[in-house]
């Protein structure tokens, strides 16, 4: 982290036509979070930084998405598409406020890491005036080359303009930059548009800064940090890279993933050490799994809190508001939504628990349903400690079942049940001996008569 003031300009005005989508490109998601929000999280990870969004199509939606994670930000519309330097200058008002550092990043590079941006800012703190983030791809073909002389970056040369000798250079332009705030407007205003497209290219400020005798340098970051997203195939590739990073991070922190490539996490998933996750598990946003928990295969968790040594699945679904205490269990083909499950409570199979509180050590039998919705409103079911809910019971909310109560299997419970009570809510069984034989003979005769008449 650094204490220097910083303005991060996030370029998010691209049309994204290759995405073939009505959704602005930067709002497509990796690990459940919009691309642009990944970028904003990275710049915030470098220390104190104000954010200026340069937006185009879907401006309000883009701004709203960013403000959900970062609070109020400035947004500036790029009304004409006249190049990257022109896009940066759309935020002239913010730049003019005066900052120690200026970060220029792209809203479609979700894999940029805070440590890479921090390295660029640290170079500014050490005396650099302009820092370009570069990378070394397996093949540099098609990328702009970073031209260095005597430890200084002197120019960025595009592939089509490079000499044969320059094309041999493997150090390429990643597009992201950091520059000293006091020079920002002078450098940007000096960029011209004397080129075939008549556009203002941000890359030109390198040669301009070098010509002014400023300290211009480049740093190298991993290739995946500067991957831009232009189509759905690249979006999927970015998802794969992000997931692999997260899987490795968790395994190195003490989480067991039996088949890592089959487990998918969200941007904010928290898994504590000594959790074991079996194959084919999906984590949606806002999930926290405490130490020692076991997540069986084919489980889906979203907005859930899982306590220490709890057990989930297989084939379990935890929806937002599911809060499972220590050593509780939600087994196969169970769904839990907006419910607190007490310590040691068991919901073993084929059950729906919604808008409920289940006490410690209670047992919920197979096929139990909390009937929480009347078509208009949701109602709550409260089950005390050590209660036993027999299989195939329907608990019609609002209803409260006391501690140590016993609900007989197959019951429909519509009224509160006191502590230590036994409740039966079903018709009494009648057994008519010999009636089955009579019915079989009757139905056989009817069937035979139909066959003769054909």
From Swiss-Prot:
Metabolic or biological pathway: Nucleotide-sugar biosynthesis; UDP-N-acetyl-alpha-D-glucosamine biosynthesis; N-acetyl-alpha-D-glucosamine 1-phosphate from alpha-D-glucosamine 6-phosphate (route II): step 2/2; Nucleotide-sugar biosynthesis; UDP-N-acetyl-alpha-D-glucosamine biosynthesis; UDP-N-acetyl-alpha-D-glucosamine from N-acetyl-alpha-D-glucosamine 1-phosphate: step 1/1; Bacterial outer membrane biogenesis; LPS lipid A biosynthesis
Catalytic reaction(s) noted: alpha-D-glucosamine 1-phosphate + acetyl-CoA = N-acetyl-alpha-D-glucosamine 1-phosphate + CoA + H(+); N-acetyl-alpha-D-glucosamine 1-phosphate + UTP + H(+) = UDP-N-acetyl-alpha-D-glucosamine + diphosphate
Positions bound to acetyl-CoA: 366, 372-373, 391, 409, 426
Cleavable signal peptide: none
Positions of region (Pyrophosphorylase): 1-232
Superkingdom of the source species: Bacteria
Pfam families recorded: Hexapep (PF00132), NTP_transf_3 (PF12804)
A Gene Ontology BP annotation from the UniProt entry: regulation of cell shape
Main location: cytoplasm
Keywords annotated in UniProt: Acyltransferase, Cell shape, Cell wall biogenesis/degradation, Cytoplasm, Magnesium, Metal-binding, Multifunctional enzyme, Nucleotidyltransferase, Peptidoglycan synthesis, Repeat, Transferase
Cofactor, how bound (note): Binds 1 Mg(2+) ion per subunit.
Annotated GO MF terms: glucosamine-1-phosphate N-acetyltransferase activity; magnesium ion binding; UDP-N-acetylglucosamine diphosphorylase activity
Example of a GO cellular component annotation carried by this entry: membrane
Enzyme Commission number(s) of this protein: 2.7.7.23, 2.3.1.157
Necessary cofactors: Mg(2+)
Segments of this protein annotated with the region Linker: 233-253
Keyword Transmembrane belongs to the record: no
Assembly and interaction partners: Homotrimer.
Annotated family: In the N-terminal section; belongs to the N-acetylglucosamine-1-phosphate uridyltransferase family.
Protein role: Catalyzes the last two sequential reactions in the de novo biosynthetic pathway for UDP-N-acetylglucosamine (UDP-GlcNAc). The C-terminal domain catalyzes the transfer of acetyl group from acetyl coenzyme A to glucosamine-1-phosphate (GlcN-1-P) to produce N-acetylglucosamine-1-phosphate (GlcNAc-1-P), which is converted into UDP-GlcNAc by the transfer of uridine 5-monophosphate (from uridine 5-triphosphate), a reaction catalyzed by the N-terminal domain.
Protein name (Swiss-Prot/TrEMBL): Bifunctional protein GlmU
Species whose genome carries this gene: Brucella canis (strain ATCC 23365 / NCTC 10854 / RM-666)
């Amino acid at each position: 982290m650094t204490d220097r003031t910083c303005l991060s300009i996030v370029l998010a005005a691209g049309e994204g036509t290759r995405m073939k989508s009505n959704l602005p490109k930067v709002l497509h998601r990796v690990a459940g979070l919009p691309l642009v929000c990944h970028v904003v999280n990275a710049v915030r990870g470098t220390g104190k930084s104000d954010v200026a969004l340069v937006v185009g199509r879907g401006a309000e939606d883009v701004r709203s998405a960013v403000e959900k994670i970062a609070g109020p930000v400035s947004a500036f519309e790029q009304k004409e598409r006249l190049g990257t330097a022109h896009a940066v200058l759309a935020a002239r008002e913010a730049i003019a406020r005066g900052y120690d550092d200026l970060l220029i990043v792209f809203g479609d590079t979700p894999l940029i890491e805070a440590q890479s941006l921090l390295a660029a800012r640290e170079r500014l703190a050490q005396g650099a005036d302009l820092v370009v983030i570069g990378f070394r791809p397996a093949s540099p073909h098609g990328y702009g080359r970073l031209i260095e002389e005597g430890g200084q970056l002197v120019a960025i040369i595009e592939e089509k303009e490079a000499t044969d000798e320059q094309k041999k250079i493997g150090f390429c332009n990643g597009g992201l930059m950091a520059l000293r705030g006091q020079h920002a407007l002078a450098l940007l205003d000096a960029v011209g548009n004397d080129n075939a497209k008549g556009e203002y290219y941000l890359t030109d400020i390198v040669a301009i800064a070098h010509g002014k005798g400023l300290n211009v340098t480049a740093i190298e970051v991993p290739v995946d940090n500067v991957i831009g997203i232009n189509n759905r195939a690249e979006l999927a590739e970015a998802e794969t890279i992000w997931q692999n990073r997260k899987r490795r991070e968790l395994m190195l922190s003490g989480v067991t993933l039996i088949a890592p490539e089959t487990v998918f996490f969200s941007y904010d998933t928290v898994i504590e050490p000594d959790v074991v996750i079996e194959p084919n598990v999906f984590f949606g946003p806002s999930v926290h799994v405490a130490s020692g928990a076991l997540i069986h295969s084919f489980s889906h968790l979203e907005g859930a809190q899982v306590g220490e040594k709890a057990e989930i699945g297989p084939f379990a679904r935890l929806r937002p508001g599911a809060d499972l205490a220590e050593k509780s269990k939600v087994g196969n083909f169970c769904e839990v939504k907006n419910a607190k499950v007490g310590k040691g409570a068991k919901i073993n199979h084929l059950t729906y628990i919604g808008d409920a509180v289940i006490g410690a050590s209670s047992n919920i039998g197979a096929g139990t349903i909390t009937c929480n919705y009347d078509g208009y409103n949701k109602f709550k079911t409260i089950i005390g400690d050590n209660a036993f809910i027999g299989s195939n019971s329907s608990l019609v909310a609002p209803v409260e079942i006391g501690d140590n109560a016993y609900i007989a299997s197959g019951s429909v419970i519509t009224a509160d049940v006191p502590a230590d009570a036994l409740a039966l809510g079903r018709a009494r069984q009648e057994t008519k001996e010999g009636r089955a034989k009579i019915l079989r003979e009757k139905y056989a005769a009817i069937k035979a008569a139909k066959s003769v008449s054909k």
